[in-house]
Amino acid sequence: MEAIKKKMQAMKLEKDNAMDKADALEAQARDANRKADKILEEVQDLKKKPSQVETDFTTTKENLATANKNLEDKEKTLTNTESEVASLNRKVQMIEENLERSEERLGTALTKLGEASHAADEASRMCKVLENRSQQDEERMDQLTNQLKEARMLAEDADGKSDEVSRKMAQVEDDLEVAEDRVKSGDSKIMELEEELKVVGNSLKSLEVSEEKANQRVEEYKRQIKTLTVKLKEAEARAEYAEKYVKKLQKEVDRLEDELGINKDRYRALADEMDQTFAELSGY
């Protein structure tokens, strides 16, 4: 009887242990079910994540292609701008060379103008000298004429002195002829100087016109240089802006590439996590 009681107690204890173990197993089963449900939810989320990652990857790839195209366009624009700047530099250099040549021609013209002015002043001075000489010769001729008149009067008053008077008259007539020749020579010289003065005046007018045209060309070259300088600065500003924009695009491309790499790493991590989860589920 005692043995039966012990056996029943042992069986009851075994039953209690079995019930406790069953409760524990049931609790473990519930935990396992909850874990399974959670894992299934995570699996569903993970299934959605690759699609989202793929969408993000596609969008990033499209953005990268667009950025590359914009970068190529900006590089072409930068190349064209650099060509335009080089062309403007060549034009400015050519205009500066033309300006230097024009300034040299202007300097030569001013030198010739100075020489012509000096020649005109010299010719005017000679004209005044010859006019003074001509006036002196005319005064001398008037004086000789008066002497001739006096000699004739003396000849009329004194017949006895006719030989002396004739000699004086001859001398006076010779002096008068010399004076007339000098007057004629002076008049001819004056006419020559007047013609020369006219030529010099025409040369001066021509040089003044040339100087005015040269000044106009210089002003035109200066205006062209000013305009080209403004265009050059604008082209340089556009080139600088294009270069900054290209750098900005390059940074954006680098950022997209980094983001793409991060997304790839994230996708690989998610794939590894999914594989591990499936392996754990298969173990259950």
UniProtKB/Swiss-Prot annotation:
The scientific name of the source species is Lepisma saccharinum
Record field: compositional bias (Basic and acidic residues): 155-171
The record comments on the domains as follows:
The molecule is in a coiled coil structure that is formed by 2 polypeptide chains. The sequence exhibits a prominent seven-residues periodicity.
Kindly list the biological process annotations in GO that this record carries.
regulation of muscle contraction
State what this protein does: Tropomyosin, in association with the troponin complex, plays a central role in the calcium dependent regulation of muscle contraction.
What name appears for this protein in its UniProt entry? Tropomyosin Lep s 1.0101
What InterPro entries would the database entry show? Tropomyosin
The superkingdom of the source organism is: Eukaryota
Q: How does it assemble?
A: Homodimer.
One GO molecular function term? protein homodimerization activity
Region feature (Disordered): 155-187
Give the record's family classification. Belongs to the tropomyosin family.
What taxonomic ancestry is recorded? Eukaryota, Metazoa, Ecdysozoa, Arthropoda, Hexapoda
**Pfam families reported for this sequence:** Tropomyosin (PF00261)
